[in-house]
């Protein structure tokens, strides 16, 4: 299966999920999950070769730097991962405890990461070498630092979410959806781990060529989207039946 097909399927799953969950934007306890899906869609779209060949050229004319759309997409991934952690913590803690935990362990590291990412992106091959697929840009010191920082942050956030899902799955009523979310988080973590390894071992880059990262990243986005849509349909079905 080509990368373009993977991206198209993932964006289709995300679009369908957002349609199913369209009323959740005004629902306090569901909006974080919906925001996660939307931002993953933005990230996948901006990282796609099509975006690089169109939006990327426009941004180059404005900034003089290549691959700016990919950097924006990666920022969207960080916020998406933060949103899904927020959603998970909301299921496990009361509001005050959740807000404290989120600010200390999620919001603060993510906020620090984004400007540091911009600096490492701007100073290395990330902004100097054009490729339609950013995963195929050869790494130098700064781009390797960029990938390690980005993927390390995402590993931390997704690992935090996975830990919350391990707690949530102890509840028999939540076990099925927790297992699916856990699988999605692991897929995202595998994408990050693959990218870190290829950054540290440049000889592997032409062999992997970004394909494994795309497979795991798209699996993460599609599974989160489908699981969130399914979860919302179950809730609305229960609410509808309880009224009769």
Where are these regions (language model features)?
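Membrane-proximal helix-loop-helix units in multi-pass membrane proteins
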Residues: 89-158
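Alpha-helical transmembrane segments of polytopic membrane proteins
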Residues: 1-10, 66-79, 139-155, 208-222
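Membrane-helix interface motif
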Residues: 45-57, 119-132, 196-204
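Juxtamembrane/interface segments of multi-pass membrane proteins
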Residues: 59-63, 127-140, 167-176, 201-208
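Membrane-interfacial loop-to-transmembrane alpha-helix junctions, especially the N-terminal start
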Residues: 25-38, 101-107, 173-184, 209-216
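C-terminal transmembrane-bundle signature of multipass membrane proteins
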Residues: 13, 152-244
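Membrane-proximal first intracellular loop
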Residues: 1-70, 174
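Internal transmembrane alpha-helix with an interfacial aromatic "cap," most often the third helix
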Residues: 17-18, 69-107
């Amino acid at each position: 299966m080509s990368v373009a097909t993977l991206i198209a399927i993932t964006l289709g799953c995300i679009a369908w999920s957002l349609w199913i969950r369209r009323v959740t934007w005004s629902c306090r306890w569901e909006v974080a999950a919906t925001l996660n899906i939307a931002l993953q869609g933005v990230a996948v779209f901006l990282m796609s070769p099509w975006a690089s060949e169109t939006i990327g050229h426009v941004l180059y004319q404005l900034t003089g730097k290549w691959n700016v759309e990919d950097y924006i997409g990666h920022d969207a991934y960080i916020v998406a991962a933060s949103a899904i952690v927020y959603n998970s913590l909301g299921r496990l803690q009361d509001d005050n405890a959740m807000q404290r935990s989120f600010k200390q362990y999620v919001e603060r590291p993510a906020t620090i990461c984004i400007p540091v990412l911009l600096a490492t992106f701007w100073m290395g091959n990330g902004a100097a070498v054009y490729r339609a697929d950013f995963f195929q840009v050869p790494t130098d010191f700064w781009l390797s630092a960029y990938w390690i920082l980005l993927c390390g942050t995402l590993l931390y956030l997704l690992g935090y979410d996975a830990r919350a899902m391990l707690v949530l799955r102890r509840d028999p009523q939540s076990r099925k959806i927790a297992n699916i979310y856990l699988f999605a988080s692991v897929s995202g973590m595998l994408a990050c781990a693959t990218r870190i390894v290829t950054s540290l071992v440049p000889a592997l880059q032409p062999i992997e060529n970004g394909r494994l990262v795309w497979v795991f990243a798209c699996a993460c986005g599609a599974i989160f989207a489908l699981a969130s849509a399914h979860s919302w349909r179950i809730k609305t079905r229960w609410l509808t039946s309880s009224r009769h």
